[in-house]
A protein has these predicted regions:
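TRAFAC-class small GTPase G-domain
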Residues: 2-190
Length: 190
């Protein structure tokens, strides 16, 4: 049994396929750092506008996507939340393939959370030497327990030749969006 509609047959025109979601740019952004530095909380706050303090660590990697409009361009940000646990560390170089940018997070209330910065910057630059990397100090809302001052974060960012330094609060949302916008602007300027 055949079904057809005369009007459709007569009015058949050339159809131009355009994907429902077309972007001017798509950027892969890595979130790296020790366990407990709020990488997942940062991704969730930016992409989903939720704060969910969780003890659950990503098993290897979690993915988030957010579309932003900047400088008249529609930009898709693919955010890769890389598990910081020791048992997944061997996967980090594999996940970093094709990355356009990265954020290395540390906890300003725990100076030990900076232990991996040298290793992480080396892994990222091994894959792409001019990759923009931002150093992010998390948990800025807990000022009374601060172990690392802002000036120290800036020094570390300069020492490792990182693009910039920022402090965020995933609980209040302070500087969360600005950090991603700053990184996206760096990518657009390249």
């Amino acid at each position: 049994m055949k079904f057809w509609n005369k009007r459709i047959v007569r009015k058949r025109r050339k159809v131009i396929f355009r994907p429902p979601y077309s972007y001017d740019y798509t950027f892969k952004i890595m979130l790296l750092g020790e366990p407990g530095v709020e990488k997942t909380a940062l991704a969730q706050k930016f992409c989903l506008d939720i704060f969910s303090p969780s003890e659950k660590l990503p098993v290897g990697v979690d993915f988030y996507v957010k579309t932003v409009e900047l400088q008249g361009k529609k930009i898709k940000l693919q955010i890769w939340d890389i598990g910081g646990d020791e048992r997944f560390r061997f996967l980090t170089p594999i996940y970093c393939n094709g990355a356009n940018a990265a954020m290395i997070l540390f906890d300003i209330t725990n100076s030990q959370s900076l232990n991996q910065i040298s290793e992480l910057t080396n892994i990222l630059r091994e894959k792409k030497s001019d990759i923009p990397i931002i150093l992010i100090g998390s948990k800025m809302e807990i000022k009374e327990f601060r172990e690392l001052q802002r000036e120290r974060g800036i020094e570390i960012a300069k020492k490792y030749n990182l693009s910039s330094y920022s402090e965020i609060s995933t609980k209040t949302g302070q500087n969360v969006e600005n950090s991603f916008i700053d990184l996206t602007e760096i990518l657009l300027s390249q």
